[in-house]
Curated annotation (Swiss-Prot):
NDH-1 can be composed of about 15 different subunits; different subcomplexes with different compositions have been identified which probably have different functions. GO terms for cellular component: plasma membrane-derived thylakoid membrane. It is an enzyme of class 7 (translocase). Keywords: Membrane, NAD, NADP, Plastoquinone, Quinone, Thylakoid, Translocase, Transmembrane, Transmembrane helix, Transport. Its EC number is 7.1.1.-. The gene is ndhB. This is NAD(P)H-quinone oxidoreductase subunit 2. NDH-1 shuttles electrons from an unknown electron donor, via FMN and iron-sulfur (Fe-S) centers, to quinones in the respiratory and/or the photosynthetic chain. The immediate electron acceptor for the enzyme in this species is believed to be plastoquinone. Couples the redox reaction to proton translocation, and thus conserves the redox energy in a proton gradient. Cyanobacterial NDH-1 also plays a role in inorganic carbon-concentration. It holds the Pfam family Proton_antipo_M. The keyword Repeat does not apply.
Length: 526
């Protein structure tokens, strides 16, 4: 006889309550849009925001839960996943606020856009807690396919179609590479799919052949993850996709998708690859160096705000990798804190870009010349967000970088931290270049677009949500610096409450000693 209570205990469906709320919200928006048509745009954005806020409340109720394993080990609702899922949900809320006016102007259905965005959010949230290979791949593909659809959503725009095609082709290749890597893990572990079981199985085997194959699996898995976080040299899609995609979509990809990628990186590398810890540290060190240097250097030559922010996001990914490479409690906590403040300063910057493009139809940096004289509030908001991205005190970005660099320095990553400081200083130049251009005082230096700058009416449909999103982002960017200590304490608490990371930090030395005894060379032919 089937014991339903045992099955219910093993499934532990409460672990995915936040995702369940997002699914219900998605269905409400979808059905409402089908029944009411265009008139549903008056309430669908707010219904989606309420649902996402409900998901955040559900995440809060799970904070101190000790029963975090659900669905036979496929999902882990530990504090680490709660932190990342919260960041993803907040990024989705902000994206919805900034997208209403933009999507309405393009003439495409808003309800469908929100449904696809909620699906991408759902995939990213599941990916943050996925603890099993099948769950990881399904979540990753849910996020990826939704992202492709969002990228090409404004189908009347040829740039959007081109961006979607490039993203689809490169993303499909990346997914195939990642799938090959995790299929190797499945074979090496003797058919295990849970990450902890895979690590235990390979630790018990420990032969030279398994070690070589494990490194190959590691390389393929890192390639797939690097595509998702836009790490060099897997970044080629980023500038073109960011430039051609709808700006709210770019904002979500730069934060929500990237946060999910880093959550996957932590869980997969720490849990499944402890025997090759030195190898993945070496690979990510190279990725961090390339991302920080190329991202911040190439950004200096950009003439489009969206391309500038694209290369900026590549450089920011390099900074976040320092926390991953530190492999300490402070390192992982600094990653979470930086992604949280990066959410607000980056989305705030994109909100300002949307406001400017709605009124001028351009995102060229040269057209921002003299903006202060016509729109001082927009100039102030964009300046604060850009200066925070550059790490200027006392804004949130400064404290985020301080925590990352300090964690890296304590872990002995001296040259990497010094390179991070140098490239961070270089990034300040291209951020301040935009700020300086906006505050020119001479009338003859103003761009033609600014000379004919139209007045804004906040009473137009979708403008109020955009205004709220901008105010919240700018305030958070400004105040998060003052509140950095309690926010970092919260991030540190999420690491301390995660058994996976605690055990990994304790066993790092043991794993390295075991790995040093393994032979990674190819067998010689007799």
């Amino acid at each position: 006889m089937i014991d339903l209570s045992t099955i219910a205990a093993q499934l532990n469906a409460r672990t995915i309550l936040p995702e369940g709320i997002v699914v219900i919200t998605l269905l409400v928006v979808l059905v409402g849009d089908l029944i009411l048509g265009r008139s549903s745009t008056k309430w669908t954005p707010y219904a989606a925001i309420v649902g996402l806020l409900g998901a955040i409340v559900a995440l809060y109720t799970q904070w101190d839960s000790s029963n975090t394993i659900g669905f036979l080990g496929a999902f882990n609702a530990d504090a680490l996943s709660i932190a990342f899922r919260g960041i993803i949900a907040i990024s989705a809320i902000t994206t919805i606020l900034m997208s209403v006016a933009y999507i309405e102007q393009t003439g495409t259905p808003l309800g469908e856009f929100i449904c696809i965005l909620l699906t991408a959010t759902l995939g990213a949230m599941f990916l943050s807690g996925a603890d099993e290979l099948v769950m990881i791949f399904i979540s990753l593909e849910t996020l990826s396919i939704s992202s492709y659809l969002l990228t090409g959503y404004t189908k009347r725009d040829p740039r959007s179609n081109e961006a979607a095609l490039k993203y689809l082709l490169i993303g499909a290749a990346s997914s195939a590479i990642f799938l090959y890597g995790i299929s190797l893990l499945y074979g090496l572990s003797g058919g295990e799919t849970r990450l902890t079981a895979i690590a235990s199985s390979m630790a018990n085997a420990g032969s030279a052949n398994i070690s070589l194959a494990l490194v190959i699996a590691l390389v393929f898995a890192i390639a797939g993850i690097s595509f998702k976080i836009s790490a060099v040299p897997f970044h080629q899609w980023t500038p073109d996709v960011y430039e051609g995609s709808p700006t709210p979509v770019v904002a979500f990809l730069s934060v929500g998708s990237k946060a999910a990628g880093f959550a996957l990186a932590i869980r997969l590398l720490v849990t499944a690859f402890p025997l090759v810890s030195e190898q993945w540290h070496f690979v990510f060190t190279a990725l961090a160096i390339l991302s920080m240097v190329l991202g911040n250097v190439v950004a200096l030559a950009q003439t489009s705000m969206k391309r500038l922010l694209a290369y900026s996001s590549i450089g920011q990914a390099g900074f976040v990798m320092i926390g991953l490479l530190a492999n300490t409690e402070a390192g992982y906590a600094s990653m979470i804190f930086y992604l949280l403040v990066y959410l607000f300063m980056n989305l705030g910057g994109f909100t300002c870009v949307i406001l400017f493009s709605l009124r001028t139809g351009t995102d060229q940096i040269s057209e921002y010349a003299g903006l202060y004289q016509k729109d001082p509030l927009l100039t102030l908001g964009l300046s604060l967000c850009l200066l925070s991205l550059g790490g200027i005190p006392p804004l949130a970005g400064f404290f985020g970088k301080i925590y990352l660099f300090w964690a890296g320095w304590q872990a002995g990553l001296y040259w990497l931290v010094l390179l991070g400081l140098i490239t961070s200083v270089a990034s300040i130049y291209y951020y301040i270049r935009v700020v300086k251009m906006m505050v020119v005082k001479e009338p003859q230096e103003m761009s033609d677009v600014i000379k004919n700058y139209p007045p804004i009416s906040w009473k137009l449909p979708g403008m109020r949500p955009l205004q709220v999103g901008l105010i919240l982002s700018v305030l958070a960017t400004s105040l998060a610096g003052i509140l950095s200590n309690p926010l970092f304490t919260l991030a540190n608490s999420s690491i301390a409450k995660t058994p996976m990371l605690n055990s990994a930090l304790v066993k790092t030395v043991e794993a390295n000693s075991v790995a040093s005894q393994l032979d990674f060379s190819l067998p010689s032919k007799n």
